[in-house]
């Protein structure tokens, strides 16, 4: 349990009375409806949507009615799900699956079981002796809206086994279960945390700041409030109501219970849930935000990459600030309670936290010392939730009983917790114009994030924080201020003083001038005043008028864009490729359409991957074949665990092994998949032995791109890199050129990823923005007069970073990152030719 730090500053020197005037309520207003969408050939309906013109605020009326309207229509295009599947099997729904899954005893067609409907007994080839999936496995396939914290409809078909027979054993249930083909890993491991996490926040403003979610887009970085509870809407509404009358502080009590852990497969190997696949098929191939926004409403913004099944306990207790102050609770900062002595749920120490105990009893406002809060519970029986909404300060045993009863119910009624997410657009595949629709869904997600940007809100008074909740804006107030606009109360200590500036929303894009368009925003929502800080960021932004990715897709899938002539002639399905398949195959192949082949995991494509539908209605296919390039893990000895866990490993990929259950590894811990498709060194040389006394073990010295974990060096993650020199690099597998840093390239090489340096002009490197002191890179130093970072001289380098090979004036030489960065900073043209010293490349 964390050590509790209570920043409840009541005994401050000087209070500043807030003389703000009350803000008039602002009623929500709808904008006009957008035009009707194209008529859907499958549902014979069209939709239109209206956005919010004015968000309700300060207690004003909400918008009434639905944002969407739907009407019947006569389509001018057919339904894509009625087309054939070429060499693949067509389910009744129109979804296509591999013919190898037909008559295998499993219902791989999600909703209709068409693949098993007409199979004779003699044709059936059962692929496994059991078909019982792990309990609650269907939860791992749900979509998730990261802004609302709510799970949405199913996007992954968790019922399909993919023709595989992978089993997992539950020690608790003493039974074997069969894993879905979409699950990479599933582990039954019960984890019960007996240490509760207690946190105090001196205002809802502090709490919202702490729990905000930061979203990074192509244009800017934005922060939005997101409750981790599925009841986030009721939480924020209640918070707004409760702060109209007085100031509250928050005590947050949290804990989790885990019963299983899962990792889903990579997106290209996931089978989509049939309803989700249908919705993707119905999406228009021309960008229409209304249609794509409707998909986000139904299925969320992300899908689950991994997570745990279990329960999450989280209760917010509101404590009256004035009552805490009246009880002279002003020295908690100096008398922090120790984590071993302060437990509301399990026990209550009689010493060390007496001031806190007395203050909370007084602030509870009840005779029986019951502190009531708002529970946000995920998982477990619904009948236990009411018992978790309060704490009896004099009866910790009773608190424990109620919590334990709920925790036991989690085993049978778990929910997904501790989830890691991947954007939903990564699942756009196996439908016509999939690449175009994937790009459009990314655009729609950007617009969706814009709807939750606080720039739509009017300023809160006294430095309050505005957040968007549906069609309303809410104000979260700083300590000792309250009201619908935070207009009442007092600002305390260093909270008092000036008002920080806030950004307005971006303007519309300007007309194109010389191939570029611009937009702007102002720091006037509110403007800085009284010595407050100005906004951080740029006031203008420019970009190319034509999206480069969209232009590329026009060449790759011209039939997905308006043409002067509508294609009337089509090629048959592309020819099959052994050990490979067509990416985003679709169902229609008009003249001029290109398709791209790729190989199954563990194979690499040799030759030209692009085939084209010719005017003679025949496919123009070059020489190509799939060559095996992967290693497979052997059966490991008991107790040995491998990371990462994958069905196949390509040449150059690295696997690390470790021991569980108090054992230590004897032998090598890292193995490389060699060009002969064998592991080097041999994995049979690794085994687990009884762990020695950790006091006698030497601490290994890790490389700069490694970190110490469990007494051994493991690869860092790219985001763990500090400031490092920017370079352009190409992913040798996808051939995509990305902006990276020297440190990130070392980390990716450590993880077995193959990246090579390219010229600086081959990608767009981050602009060298002017930085304040405290954020200077290796090659920068602080200028005391301007309080800004300026370029170092190469001779002034202190922390040098990595040694790299740099070409300067046509000659290669080894220098540190700091020295190279100093030259680039001063405008000299340099080229990084290797992320290692020059001599290391020639050896």
UniProtKB/Swiss-Prot annotation:
Summary of the function given for this chain in its UniProt record: Component of the membrane attack complex (MAC), a multiprotein complex activated by the complement cascade, which inserts into a target cell membrane and forms a pore, leading to target cell membrane rupture and cell lysis. The MAC is initiated by proteolytic cleavage of C5 into complement C5b in response to the classical, alternative, lectin and GZMK complement pathways. The complement pathways consist in a cascade of proteins that leads to phagocytosis and breakdown of pathogens and signaling that strengthens the adaptive immune system. C7 serves as a membrane anchor.
Record region (CCP 2): 616-693
PANTHER family from the UniProt entry: COMPLEMENT COMPONENT C6, COMPLEMENT COMPONENT C7
Segments of skewed composition (Acidic residues): 108-120
Occurrences of domain MACPF (ranges): 124-456
Modification(s) after translation: C-, N- and O-glycosylated. O-glycosylated with core 1 or possibly core 8 glycans.
Region (Disordered): 108-143, 219-240, 516-538
Segments of this protein annotated with the region CCP 1: 545-615
Protein name stated in the entry: Complement component C7
Main location (coarse class): secreted
Subcellular localization: Secreted; Target cell membrane
Outcome following mutation: residue 389 to T: Confirmed at protein level
Domain LDL-receptor class A: start-end pairs: 83-121
């Amino acid at each position: 349990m964390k050590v509790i730090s209570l920043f409840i500053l009541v005994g401050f020197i000087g209070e500043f009375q807030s003389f703000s005037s009350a803000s008039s309520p602002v009623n929500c207003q709808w904008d006009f409806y957008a035009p009707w969408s194209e008529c859907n050939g499958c549902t014979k309906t069209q939709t239109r949507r209206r956005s919010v013109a004015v968000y309700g605020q300060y207690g004003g009326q909400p918008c009434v009615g639905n944002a969407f309207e739907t009407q019947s229509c006569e389509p001018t295009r057919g339904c894509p799900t009625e087309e054939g599947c070429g060499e693949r099997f067509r389910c009744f729904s129109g979804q296509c699956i591999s013919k190898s899954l037909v008559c295998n005893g499993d219902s791989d067609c999600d909703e209709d079981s068409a693949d098993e409907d007409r199979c004779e007994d003699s044709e059936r080839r059962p692929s496994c002796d059991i078909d019982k999936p792990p309990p609650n496995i269907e939860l791992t396939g749900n979509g998730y809206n990261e802004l609302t914290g709510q799970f949405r409809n199913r996007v992954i078909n968790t019922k399909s086994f993919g023709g595989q027979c992978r089993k997992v054993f539950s020690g608790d249930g003493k039974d074997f279960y069969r894993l879905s083909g979409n699950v990479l890993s599933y582990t039954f491991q019960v984890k019960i945390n007996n240490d509760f996490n207690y946190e105090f926040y001196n205002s809802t403003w502090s709490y919202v700041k702490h729990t905000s979610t930061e979203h990074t887009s192509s244009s800017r970085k934005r922060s939005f409030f997101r409750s981790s509870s599925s009841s986030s809407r009721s939480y924020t509404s209640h918070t707004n109501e409760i702060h109209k009358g007085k100031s509250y502080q928050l005590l947050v009590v949290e804990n989790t219970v885990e019963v299983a852990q899962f990792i889903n497969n990579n997106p290209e190997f996931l089978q989509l849930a049939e309803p989700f696949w249908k919705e993707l098929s119905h999406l228009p191939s021309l960008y229409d935000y209304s249609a794509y926004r409707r998909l986000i409403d139904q299925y969320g913004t992300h899908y689950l990459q991994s997570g745990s099944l279990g329960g999450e306990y989280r209760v917010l207790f509101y404590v009256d600030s004035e009552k805490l102050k009246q009880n002279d609770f002003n020295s908690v900062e100096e008398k922090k309670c120790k984590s071993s002595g302060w437990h509301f749920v399990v026990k209550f120490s009689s010493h060390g936290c007496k001031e806190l105990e007395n203050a909370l009893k007084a602030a509870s406002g009840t005779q029986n010392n019951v502190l009531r809060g708002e529970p946000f519970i995920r998982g477990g029986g619904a009948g236990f939730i009411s018992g978790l909404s309060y704490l009896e300060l004099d009866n910790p045993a009773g608190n424990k009983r109620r919590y334990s009863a709920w925790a036991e119910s989690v085993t049978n009624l778990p929910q997904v917790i501790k989830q890691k997410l991947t954007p939903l657009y990564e699942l756009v595949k196996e439908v016509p114009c999939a690449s175009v629709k994937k790009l459009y869904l990314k655009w729609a997600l950007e617009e969706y994030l814009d709807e939750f940007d606080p720039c739509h809100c009017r300023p809160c008074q006294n430095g309050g924080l505005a957040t968007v909740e549906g069609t309303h804006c809410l104000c979260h107030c700083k300590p000792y201020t309250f009201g619908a606009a935070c207009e009442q109360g007092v600002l305390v200590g260093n909270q008092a003083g000036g008002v920080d500036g806030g950004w307005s929303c971006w303007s519309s894009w300007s007309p194109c001038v010389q191939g570029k368009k611009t937009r702007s925003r102002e720091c006037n929502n509110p403007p800085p005043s009284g010595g407050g800080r100005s906004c951080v960021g740029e006031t203008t932004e420019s970009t190319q008028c034509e999206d480069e990715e969209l232009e590329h897709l026009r060449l790759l899938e011209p039939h997905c864009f308006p043409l002067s002539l509508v294609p009337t002639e089509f090629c048959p399905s592309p020819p099959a490729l052994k050990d490979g398949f067509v990416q985003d195959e679709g169902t229609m192949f008009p003249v001029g359409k290109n398709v791209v082949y790729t190989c199954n995991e563990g194979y690499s494509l040799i030759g030209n991957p692009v085939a084209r539908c010719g005017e003679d209605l025949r496919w123009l296919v070059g020489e190509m074949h799939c060559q095996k390039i992967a290693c497979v893990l052997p059966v490991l000895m008991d107790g040995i665990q491998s990371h990462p866990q994958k069905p196949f490993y390509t040449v150059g990929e690295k696997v690390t092994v470790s021991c569980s259950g108090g054992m230590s590894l004897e032998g090598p811990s890292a193995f490389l998949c060699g060009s002969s498709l064998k592991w080097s060194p041999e994995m049979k040389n690794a085994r687990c032995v009884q762990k020695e006394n950790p006091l006698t073990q030497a601490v290994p010295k890790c490389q700069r791109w490694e970190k110490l974990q469990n007494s051994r060096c493991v690869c860092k993650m790219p985001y763990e890199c500090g400031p490092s020199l920017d370079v352009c690099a190409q992913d040798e597998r996808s051939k995509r050129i990305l902006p990276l840093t020297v440190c990130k390239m070392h980390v990716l090489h450590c993880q077995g990823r193959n990246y090579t340096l390219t010229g600086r002009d081959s990608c767009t490197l981050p602009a060298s923005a002017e930085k304040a002191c405290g954020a200077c890179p290796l090659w920068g130093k602080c200028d005391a007069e301007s309080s800004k970072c300026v370029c170092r001289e190469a001779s002034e380098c202190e922390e040098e970073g990595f040694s790299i090979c740099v070409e300067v004036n046509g000659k290669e030489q080894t220098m540190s990152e700091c020295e190279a960065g100093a030259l680039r900073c001063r405008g000299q043209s340099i080229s990084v030719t290797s992320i290692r010293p020059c001599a290391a490349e020639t050896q």
